[in-house]
Each structure stands twice: as structure tokens, then as C-alpha cells.
Amino acid sequence: MKERLKKLKILFLTNNQITNPLYLWLRKKAYIYKFTKPLNKTILQKINPDIVISYNYRYIIKKEFLKKYYFINLHISYLPFNRGAHPNIWSFIENTKKGVTIHLIDEGIDTGDILVQKRVVLDKNDSFKSTYKKLHFHIQMLFKQNFKKLINKKIKPKKQPKNGTFHLSKELPSIDYNKPIYKVLKEINANRKT
């Protein structure tokens, strides 16, 4: 396995500093290339990655790339709930299951087959800022625990259930990320009634 890891090439797609602990961990395991811009054919051909990891990456990946390379996404929701933007917050607003999911990437947004997922207990007395950090901690731990299986494609993907939810950034009301969640939810509900 060590020989395989030395030769393993990973393309790490991200747009957020919260992903750095996982990126640094991966640097010890394989050749890793961090990329923050829209993915293009040139970078894929140059690196020719064994696996492409999308983690807090804001750009849509072209269908033609998905056919040729192995893409996975790390998403901080318990799919199929809260696909898209701000899954942490929507899980409280809509009172859906909370957790983290690693899934294959397909043409949709967070709709690919599920590889692994984990429920996470979050408290309404915490803030959205602290629960966001907690979910990122859990997604990174889930990835590390399943790293060898993920890179060797030893996990059988399962189709996502048809139900679920999807949200865009513009749908989110203005909120204070540092307030206790229960207070923010009261404010959101009060604003919806007016």
C-alpha cells in the first residue's frame, strides 16, 4: 500500500480554508495538487489524477471530465437532504437529518451515488459557526477512516433516495452565525410570519 500511495496523484478542488487540515493530511499520503479555479481540461491532462476530491468547491464540473476521471465530493449534509448551499443551516431550518456524506460526483449538484455517510448530533444551543466547524471535523474524520477504500474504489456506491432538498445561497435569510441557533430560528420564523 505504501508504494501505491507514493505514486497516487490527487487533485484537491477547494475554495475554503477550512479544508486545509485535510489537504495537509493528504500531502503526507500522496502527490496532491490543490486547485481553486474552475476546472479545465489542461490541468486534468497535466496532472492526470487517480482521484479528484471536491471539498467546499464552488464550481460545477463538466460532464466530459466526469466520464474520464474518478471524482468524489465531501458534503456537510446527510444526503439527500440539503444539497447545495449552506446545508448546515438548512438542516435546522427544515429540521432534517444532520450529518456528512462522501459521494460520487455526477451532473447534478450533490446528487451522485453515496459512498459513505455519518449522522452527527448538533445542538440548537450552539451557533451555526460552531456546528459548521463540527461538521467539517466529522467529514474529514470520515474521509480519513475510509481513505484506503475510497482511493481503491472498494466501497459500493448506493443510489440517493429521490426525496431530499436543494438550496441556493440566495435563499438563505440574513442571519448572525455567532448567535445560538434556537434564537436565530425564532427570528427566521418571526420574519416568515410577517
Regions found by a protein language model. Name each.
Residues 1-194:
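One-carbon transfer enzymes
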